[in-house]
């Protein structure tokens, strides 16, 4: 069993920063130029689902988050150059990700799951709200780590143009 440091170790990535949470909704495609344009003024917090698209577009996230317990989640990061990008992994997320993620990995504990709450309390760590969504978890992390502003990109909460995800992310 691999011991993972707790995600508050990288809270400075978010503290007093303008954090852009990037989801894999179809609207992300039209926002890629804006992400490039403002890259130096924002902290990009990407869901695992969109990380590959961002990297292929030359947009390197400041952090990536994965919360899903499904065993195939490793496919979101397999083959990506993530050596310098911290990953926040929810305590109940698929451990398969650890076999393929090349960069530093930090654990986040969630409210609503007793074992995670107990561990967080025992070690003095924060526990985060998930709302059943990776973007909700990312939002609570950004807020608890005192982000100045939080902006959503690609968090559509709808079928934009009849699509549930961005072009290249449809089946991952």
Name what the model sees in each region:
Residues 43-46, 60-70, 86-89, 105-110, ...:
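Short hydrophobic/aromatic-enriched beta-strand-loop microsegments
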Residues 96-157:
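Active-site/ligand-binding-proximal alpha/beta "capping" segment
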Residues 26-27, 45-46, 68-72, 79, ...:
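Short, glycine/acidic-rich beta->alpha junctions
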Residues 42, 62, 130-133, 162:
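Long alpha-helical, hydrophobic tracts
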Residues 170-172:
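Conserved small/polar residues in nucleotide/adenosyl-binding loops
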Residues 48-52, 89-96:
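Short, polar loop motifs at secondary-structure junctions
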Residues 1-43, 52-60, 72-84, 95, ...:
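N-terminal donor/sugar-recognition subdomains of glycan-related enzymes
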Residues 50-68, 142-166:
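Glycine-rich phosphate/pyrophosphate-binding loops
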């Amino acid at each position: 069993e691999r011991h993972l440091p707790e995600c508050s170790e990288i809270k400075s990535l978010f503290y007093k920063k303008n954090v852009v949470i990037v989801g894999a909704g179809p609207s992300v495609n039209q926002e890629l130029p804006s992400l490039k344009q403002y890259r130096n003024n924002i902290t990009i917090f990407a869901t695992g689902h969109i990380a590959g698209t961002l990297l292929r577009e030359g947009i390197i996230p400041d952090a990536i988050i994965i919360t899903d317990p499904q065993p195939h989640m490793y496919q979101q990061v397999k083959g990506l150059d993530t050596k310098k990008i911290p990953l926040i992994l929810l305590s109940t997320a698929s451990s398969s990700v650890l076999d393929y993620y090349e960069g530093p990995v930090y654990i986040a504990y969630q409210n609503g799951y007793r074992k995670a709450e107990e561990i967080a309390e025992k070690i003095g760590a924060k526990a985060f709200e998930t709302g059943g969504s990776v973007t909700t978890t990312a939002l609570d992390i950004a807020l608890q780590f005192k982000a100045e502003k939080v902006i959503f990109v690609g968090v559509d909460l709808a079928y934009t143009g009849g699509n549930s995800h961005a072009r290249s992310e449809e089946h991952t």
